[in-house]
Amino acid sequence: MQKLQLFISNTRVDLFKDESVSINQTIQNVRDIAKIFTEFTQTFTIPASKTNNKLFKHYHNYDIVNTFDARRKEAAEIQLNNVPFKKGFIRLEGVQLKKNKPYSYKITFFGETVNLKDLLGDDELSALDLSSFDIDYSFGNIKNKMQTSTGGFITPLITHTRQLYFDSGGNVGNGNLHYASSSSSNGVFWSDLKYAIRLHEIVQAIQTKYSITFSNDFFDSSNATWYNLYLWLHRKKGDVEPAQQVSMQFKTVTGFGLESDPPATTSVSGNGVNVSSTYTTYPNTILGFTFTFIPTTTDVYTIRIFRNGSQIFQAEDVTGTQLVTQSDFTLASGTYTVAIGSTSTVTFNSGNVRFAVNGNLGGTDDGSVTAWNDEWRSSSQTVTGTTFEFRINEQIPKMKVIDFLTGLFRMFNLTAFINDAGTIVVQKLDDFYAASSITHNIDEYVDIKSSSVDVALPFKEIDFAYKGLGTFLSKQFEQLENKGWGTIEYSADSTFDAPSDTYKVEIPFEHLQYQRLVNATGGANTSIQFGWFVDDNKESFYGLPLIFYAIKQSSSTTAISLKNTETSNQSMSSYWIPSNSRAISSSTSTDNIHFDLEVNEYTGGSTFTGTLFENCYKTYIQDVFNAGRRLTKVKAKLPLKIIFDLKLNDKISLHNRNYRINSIKTNLTTGDSSLELLNIV
């Protein structure tokens, strides 16, 4: 019998002597392949003792000021025999009363990875600080980012409306990329293109914003399969900005410095001021705030204020000093940025865009509060202009951060756990299992009175697909081939009639079919490949966020024509082409982001065999569909050494056979465990 100890917010709580606390552990479950799991306990009860009542602040009493906030999980740790076992969080489920007095509290323990979802919340990608990539949207910059050799931020050859082609014998300005002369009308107009950002930069920004660290097992610059992927910065269909807005362009106020005495309660990141939910949530409160704008002239200007990248306030056509206060909008938690626009040049000197906010910190046992007051001022001069500024938080696709990460995890079959150093270890599932060589023999601990051997195959078929298959060529492919572009329906080349369900792994991104251009005069292949982001009516398309590989074409390439105006263009012999494969030659790499083997758009061949299914899912899924695979259920009384040492990628040895752990449920006081094991075939 182990001694169970539970600490909540560093306070050891009292436990019932006979309370049973069981923890469930699984990281990849054969019944729900696309999900990543975390440890959790069954809901259990602890007594309403003096210590526990103080911790939960007599939660049953509605009238108590500064009560326990059950909307939030609290940090917790489970110890066994005074030795740390699991760190995580507890959630208060409720209070049981007897004779109108508190008798017990119902709580649930969750492993540390559950905190990731809580941290990210409903934040969208626009809440991330990617302001270092903000850039004017102009012919010069579009051209420069098409030719740049450093690929963190590029212009790929993807058009939002115009269809492109190549004809060395033609000289008509309707999308012909052939460069005839500097005064011809051939070429792609620069504003038909948009920028793209490397996915790695987004993941780096996630780590910075939420103060988390991912391991470099997968998210690493040396992993080209990951590092060469990009996100197209496409937030609205068609043009980046409608033509009627071109006369007024907005400039972001770049950076704030603390004017009030330190330490600050709020904080800054990039070009924004962060207001934590801690300070907007009861018992803490925001008392007031003021944005102040002091221009050097009396010219007309417009103010826009953003929270997490979404505009929440606008004051149009104002002059002179302006104040924006709590009478204009409510200050909720988030990152606040400011942009100023004008049809003329308006200057705001350093320090003349200001954000002052004050509030109270409550929550002490005696109900006392502490007042705080922060003032932030712009750290550089802001000057409006007539060139449109491409701000990443306004142009990045509308998508929650958690959905973005979940999409990547499903795409590459990644799994995650938190190590002793607090790092979130992210690995492909195959690598996770390969990382452990430890086998635990449990023969002597197994209850031989009862066990079962069940069918391990819960599905007749597993479908892998992208949710976004709405562009013209992807739709056309589906109509002609009767399958989704890049989609696979896996059933191990057999039709099973015992299981009846189909499991779907669906990725929340758009998946384009690209076009390699052929010279209409003579029929020779060019080095040009482009993406046409339109719907099946050949009209501008919104779609889902687009992920693609970018490949630099710079030697022995076909020059293309980039148009500045209708009668002015420039020849470009280096440019970034989009691709579903990491390379344009399978001798360099066969990696691609299809699930099924498809004809490569650039080569026309089928040698790019490194699909997502082949590289990330095949080993696990083929094992699931193997006729020899069984799901064995046993009960065992595990000793404390195994309970402490067991990792979910370890093997279990039972009766001279090795097994993978599908799930394990353990009573932490008795060691009684129920194990689901998958035999290794």
Indicate where each model-derived feature is located.
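Polar, S/T/G-rich
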Residues: 1-258, 353-388, 392-411, 431-438, ...
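Terminal (often C-terminal
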Residues: 241-303, 307, 348-378
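A glycine-anchored, Pro-Gly-centered beta-turn/N-cap motif
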Residues: 280-287, 320, 332-334, 657
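Exposed aromatic-hydrophobic patches
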Residues: 322-329
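Short beta-strand-plus-loop segments that form exposed binding edges in beta-rich domains
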Residues: 339-346
